[in-house]
């Protein structure tokens, strides 16, 4: 038996100019001056050449390669454009496959990229069937593989390209072609077994495979049967006859081998019934055998079937005497589909990878907006990862620097080495006490030179400034209720922040006052040293510990060097991580996965971020090792100090040393809190000055407006003096909007200062170590100016006093602005307390 495969025809097309289409698209997207930056003329010419080859007169194997590559280019472009492929403004023209004279010359033109893809995919499937036909006499296995690929292509077409104007691409027709390819691949599998030596063990296998082949041809037959008589059947007319013949023939073949299987199991009666059914189906196929006579030996199979029938009937009559069922259950034969088709994506995958780099160059100017949005989300994920590592690294570096600075480790090790290198196990110098004394001296200098060292005085200053502001605000008329409310709200917020700030240093006022007085601090510190014996007894000295101390010092020096190396390694790893994150680009990956959901994209981002884990792990390892090594150094230093002191210490001396350490720790905490207090308090004072200037300026404006109203009661009011917009900055006197209308309009506006307050901010800040949380404070200086609300030009001021007032105010504001620019802070990062949206209840 020889296989017969349907002859599918290719679709024809008209020439296409990709150079014109892509250049036109890029010009519209980037303009005539920039589009060439994203245009690769050589790659575009290669794309035109590739399409011409894909639709040329080449061998099927070469055509398949050209078409698969061309489709890969289309797929990469589709990833970028999606359903917006019509923006290319290109005419894709394709002709229907000519199976009849009625289809000759039928062509369809569309602007969508999906139409070009579907037509190309149709031709790819047809080419696979042509390759299968070429190799059918040499290797069934190769033909089965190509028919399976054709089946996958047609199936993908039927499921993903719907409502096409082309008859070839209509969903029901591509599904019909998919079933034909599937049935033919299954048929080749059966014929491969039939043409080899058949054993009795293969009867049931052939029966099941033939049953599956029959079912597949049944689907094709049903499709042709459903078409009305007045509608032309898709394909050649002989297809229907051939499908009908194969349907009955493989049903007969399945029943025949099932009968042989029953005979092997000594179920002769059922076997005879299935052979009778097989004969009926074979006879049903004979009227449709016209196109298959040269491929299937119908007569030979009929003779074999008749011979087997007679043999079984004779055996049953003389030996078995089993009853023969009148009707057989053909469904009892289980169909076995031997075709496992790969997905179309799997077939295309190697070609997609092969042209990926070329597509990145060719389509680099075509990137959808949603890809940029998703890339920004991924960039934020990377930034979060980097910030975390930077913060951990900075914290570790600060821990290292603080440890080295606090212990003065290099000098300490040098002094200890000198002390014990000559075998001197004891020195009457209290090393630990000397280190404490040096540190306290540094702290005293810091406190005594700081202008905010008197905490009570600073508290009184703040209270006085609040009182000044409240006195001014209480004197303002009711029509300024909105501005008064805003200023009071800012005052309340600043007061709350100051209370937290002062709460940080109040528990340490005693220690701060001590550090502010050299006499008192050294008197107090010396109290802890009075009970230290000035000279020990020689009997208390254990000089056998000298070698051990030197060994410990050697280990500490090694650990100190390792700490320095760890710090350098951590910084180097962080630099590498920053470079990798900055150079990481997943635009291509996002384009390929453009259709994924947010959950799938999140999983994709997590997978992509895993490539940074090695460097992150190395950074974390250096941090962990540093902490462990610092603890080890501390333990060894304690052991050295213990060994270098007397063998036995009185309990009273131990108590004094412990009290001294506690006293030193309290001073350290006090200095930490005062450092935070001293850095934040100037910002608070500056803010109160700003509120005071605003309140004073508002009161002055109201007074001037009142005088103007009284003096011009019977005439239109002149506008307020114009203000220099450059002087309107945070920290200076606030500016009111310039008005060119009468005072009645000014009063009705309520002298609104909302525009001026946009840049003043109060927000909660960062937590303080070893104390209550204190919000970070800053005052961001950004110009705000009143803008005229009417077209009439402002009338210049008439009084010289106002000119002098404006000049003084402008100079003061410029000085404050220059000071803020030289010392910027990060306070008040929340939206401004003067934001109009926060006062909506007053904006009726």
Curated annotation (Swiss-Prot):
The keyword Transport applies. Residues 4-400 form the BRO1 domain. InterPro entries: ALIX_V_dom (IPR025304), BRO1_dom (IPR004328), BRO1_sf (IPR038499). Its main location: cytoplasm. Residues 781-790 have a biased composition (Low complexity). One of its GO terms (biological process) is late endosome to vacuole transport via multivesicular body sorting pathway. It is found in: Cytoplasm; Endosome. The keyword Cytoplasm applies. Keywords: Coiled coil, Cytoplasm, Endosome, Phosphoprotein, Protein transport, Transport. Residues 547-583 form a coiled coil. GO terms for cellular component: cytoplasm; cytosol; endosome; endosome membrane; extracellular vesicle. Signal peptide: none annotated. Residues 703-734, 763-844 are annotated as: Disordered. It comes from the Eukaryota. It holds the Pfam family ALIX_LYPXL_bnd. Residues 812-821 have a biased composition (Basic and acidic residues). The modification Phosphoserine is found at residue 740. One of its GO terms (molecular function) is deubiquitinase activator activity. Present with 10200 molecules/cell in log phase SD medium. The coiled-coil domain is essential for MVB sorting. Class E VPS protein involved in concentration and sorting of cargo proteins of the multivesicular body (MVB) for incorporation into intralumenal vesicles. Fusion between endosomes and the vacuole will then target the cargo proteins to the vacuolar lumen. Acts as an adapter that recruits the DOA4 deubiquitinase to the endosomes, leading to deubiquitination of cargo proteins prior to the lumenal sequestration. Its association to the endosomes depends on SNF7 and its dissociation requires VPS4. Interacts functionally with the Pkc1p-mitogen-activated protein kinase pathway. Interacts with DOA4 and SNF7. This is Vacuolar-sorting protein BRO1. It comes from Saccharomyces cerevisiae (strain ATCC 204508 / S288c) (Baker's yeast). The gene is BRO1.
């Amino acid at each position: 038996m020889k296989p017969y495969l349907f002859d599918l025809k290719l679709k024809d097309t008209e020439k296409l100019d990709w150079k014109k289409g892509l250049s036109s698209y890029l010009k519209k997207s980037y303009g005539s001056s920039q589009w060439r930056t994203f245009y690769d003329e050589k790659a575009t010419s290669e794309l035109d050449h590739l399409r011409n080859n894909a639709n040329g007169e080449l061998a099927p194997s070469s055509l398949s390669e050209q078409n698969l590559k061309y489709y890969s280019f289309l797929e990469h472009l589709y990833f970028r454009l999606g359903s917006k492929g019509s923006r290319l403004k290109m005419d894709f023209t394709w002709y229907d496959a000519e199976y009849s004279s009625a289809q000759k010359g039928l062509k369809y033109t569309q602007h969508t990229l999906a139409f070009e893809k579907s037509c190309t995919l149709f031709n790819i499937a047809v080419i696979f069937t042509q390759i299968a036909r070429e190799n059918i006499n040499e290797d069934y296995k190769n033909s089965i593989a190509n028919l399976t690929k054709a089946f996958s292509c047609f199936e993908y077409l039927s499921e993903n390209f719907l409502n096409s104007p082309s008859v070839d691409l209509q969903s029901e027709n591509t599904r019909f072609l998919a079933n034909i390819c599937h049935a033919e691949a299954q048929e080749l599998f059966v014929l491969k077994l039939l043409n080899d030596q058949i054993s009795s063990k293969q009867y049931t296998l052939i029966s099941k495979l033939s049953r599956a082949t029959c079912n597949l041809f049944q689907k094709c037959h049903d499709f042709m049967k459903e078409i009305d008589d007045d509608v032309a059947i898709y394909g050649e007319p002989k297809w229907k006859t051939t499908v009908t013949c194969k349907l009955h023939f493989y049903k007969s073949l399945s029943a025949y081998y099932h009968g042989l299987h029953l005979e092997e199991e000594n179920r002769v009666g059922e076997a005879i019934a299935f052979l009778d059914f097989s004969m009926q189906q074979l006879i049903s196929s004979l009227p449709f055998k016209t196109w298959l006579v040269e491929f299937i030996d119908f007569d030979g199979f009929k003779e074999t079937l008749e011979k087997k029938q007679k043999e079984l009937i004779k055996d049953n009559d003389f030996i078995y005497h089993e009853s023969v069922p009148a009707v057989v259950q053909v469904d009892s034969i289980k169909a076995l589909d031997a075709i496992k088709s790969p997905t179309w994506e799997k077939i295309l995958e190697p070609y997609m990878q092969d042209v990926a780099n070329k597509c990145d160059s060719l389509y680099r100017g075509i990137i959808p907006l949603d890809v940029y949005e998703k890339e920004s989300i991924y960039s934020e994920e990377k930034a979060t990862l980097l910030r975390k590592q930077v913060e951990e690294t900075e914290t570790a570096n600060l821990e290292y620097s603080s440890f080295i600075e606090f212990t003065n480790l290099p000098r300490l090790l040098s002094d200890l080495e000198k002390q014990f290198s000559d075998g001197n196990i004891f020195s009457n110098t209290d090393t630990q006490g000397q280190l404490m004394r040096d540190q306290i001296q540094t702290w005293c200098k810091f406190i005594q030179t700081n202008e905010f060292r008197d905490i009570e005085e600073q508290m009184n200053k703040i209270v006085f400034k609040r009182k000044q502001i409240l006195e001014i605000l209480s004197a303002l008329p009711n029509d300024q209720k909105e501005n008064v409310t805003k200023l009071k709200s800012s005052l309340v917020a600043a007061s709350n922040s100051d209370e937290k700030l002062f709460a940080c240093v109040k528990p340490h006022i005693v220690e701060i006052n001590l550090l502010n007085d050299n006499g008192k601090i050294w008197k107090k510190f010396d109290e802890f040293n009075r009970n230290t014996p000035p000279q020990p007894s020689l009997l208390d000295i254990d000089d056998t510990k000298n070698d051990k101390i030197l060994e410990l010092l050697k280990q500490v020096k090694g650990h100190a060097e390792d700490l320095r190396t760890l710090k350098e390694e951590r910084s180097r790893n962080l630099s590498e991580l920053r470079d990798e994150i900055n150079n990481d680009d997943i635009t291509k990956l996002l384009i390929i996965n453009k259709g994924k959901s947010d959950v799938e994209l999140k999983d994709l981002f997590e997978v992509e971020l895993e490539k940074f884990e090695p460097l992150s792990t190395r950074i974390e390892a250096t941090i962990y090792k540093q902490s462990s090594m610092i603890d080890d150094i501390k333990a060894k230093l304690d052991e050295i100090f213990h060994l270098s002191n007397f063998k036995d210490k009185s309990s009273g001396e131990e108590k004094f040393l412990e009290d001294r350490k506690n006293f030193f720790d309290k001073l350290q905490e006090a200095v930490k809190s005062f450092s935070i207090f001293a850095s934040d308090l100037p910002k608070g004072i500056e803010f109160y000055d700003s509120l005071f200037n605003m309140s004073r300026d508002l009161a002055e404006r109201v007074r001037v407006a009142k005088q103007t109203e009284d003096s011009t009661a019977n005439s239109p009011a002149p506008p307020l003096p114009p203000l220099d917009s450059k002087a309107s900055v945070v920290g200076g006197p606030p500016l009111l909007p310039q008005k060119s209308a009468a005072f009645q309009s000014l009063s009705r506006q309520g002298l609104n200062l909302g525009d001026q307050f946009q840049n003043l901010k109060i927000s909660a800040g960062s937590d303080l170590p070893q104390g209550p949380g204190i919000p970070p404070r800053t005052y961001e200086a950004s110009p705000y100016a009143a803008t005229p609300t009417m077209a009439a030009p402002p009338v210049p001021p008439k009084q010289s006093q106002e000119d002098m007032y404006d000049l003084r105010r402008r100079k003061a504001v410029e000085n404050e602005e220059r000071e803020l620019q030289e010392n910027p802070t990060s306070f008040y990062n929340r939206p401004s307390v003067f934001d109009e949206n926060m006062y909506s209840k007053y904006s009726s």
